[in-house]
A protein has these predicted regions:
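Active-site helix of classical SDR
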Residues: 122, 164
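SDR active-site lid
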Residues: 181-260
Length: 303
């Protein structure tokens, strides 16, 4: 997609983090913007910001884990703007801790948002884009799915999150292959950020009442501490990611990385797989982090 002005972008998780920055960047490029978020107040604020800039904007409160709400989002976008050219399946949440300490509700919440949210978005908006292409022979579409470096790596205390992000990488690669197979006027990309301040570490604020969080275990408290520590130390911002992403869209680039240096860890993992070695120590280059994590778990267990 080389032209953005006048095109329509749909963004889930638009109220904060990457989603908010995607919306601001789309506005800067003179796109029409459809905002979706489960959190009503944050959705209101980004809508106000864009309207103050004179942007044509539609805001829809949406729980992406519900297919009927994604369908309603697509219907609202078409009713308002008549087409959708760019979709960011971006909404995401996080839950961390030892795998056996996660409840069924933890899994259902994170898988619902991170995985089913993207599945619904891909299925519904890809079909919608094909319909748009039937009407406009010059139509070009692009779908961007937010995964993570956790889509390539596995680390302690990250089972639920890593599982969903691995799924998104695979789903998006399959989408790419299917689109190429039929020579579709649609392209796609997958964003694989490392630690970037987005607010996802506080995503429990949007956890639905029917999937309550239990009392946190020592491992879950320690994981939360370590995630927040890593995010605070990041030198890459959500705005940086938005700029990288729009450049990638313009250049039909599939993989989008915030921290290319982390690809060395991916190579190490692939080497283990190819050599049939047991999974390696993700902290081998930074053993102090493992020590800190173990100590923090012990500290939380004693409180």
């Amino acid at each position: 997609m080389k032209t953005f002005e006048g095109r329509v972008a749909v963004i889930t998780g638009a109220g904060s983090g990457f989603g908010r920055e995607f919306a601001l960047k789309a506005a800067k490029l003179k796109m029409k913007v459809v905002l979706a978020d489960v959190q009503e107040n944050s959705l209101y604020f980004i809508r106000e910001d864009l309207e103050d800039q004179g942007v044509e904007v539609l805001a829809v409160q949406c729980d992406v884990s519900k297919k009927e709400q994604i369908q309603a989002l697509a219907d609202a976008a078409m009713a308002r703007f008549g087409a959708v050219h760019l979709v960011f399946n971006n909404a995401g949440v996080c839950s961390s801790g030892l795998i056996w300490e996660h409840s069924h509700e933890d899994w259902e919440w994170v898988v619902g948002v991170n995985m089913w949210g993207v599945i619904h978005g891909v299925r519904i908006f890809t079909n919608l884009m094909f319909e748009c292409a039937k009407i406009d022979p010059t139509f070009k579409g692009h779908i961007v799915n937010t995964a993570s470096m956790a889509g390539f790596l596995t680390t302690p205390l990250s089972s639920v999150y890593d599982t969903t992000k691995h799924a998104i990488v695979a789903l998006t690669e399959c989408l790419y292959q299917d689109l190429r197979l039929v020579d579709a006027p649609i392209n796609c990309s997958v964003i694989c950020p490392y630690f970037v301040p987005t607010g996802i570490s506080q995503s429990v604020r949007n956890r639905p009442a029917n999937l309550p969080q239990g009392e946190l275990t020592a491992s879950q408290k320690a994981a939360q501490f370590m995630i927040e520590r890593a995010i605070v130390s990041s030198k890459v911002s959500a705005r940086d990611i938005a700029n990288l992403t729009f450049d990638a869209i313009a250049n039909d680039q599939f993989y989008i990385y915030s921290h290319p240096g982390a690809l060395g860890l991916v190579k190490d993992r692939m080497d283990d797989i190819l050599k049939q070695q047991n999974p390696g120590d993700p902290y081998k280059t930074a053993p102090h982090i493992r020590t800190m994590l173990v100590n923090k778990m012990a500290e939380k267990a004693n409180k």
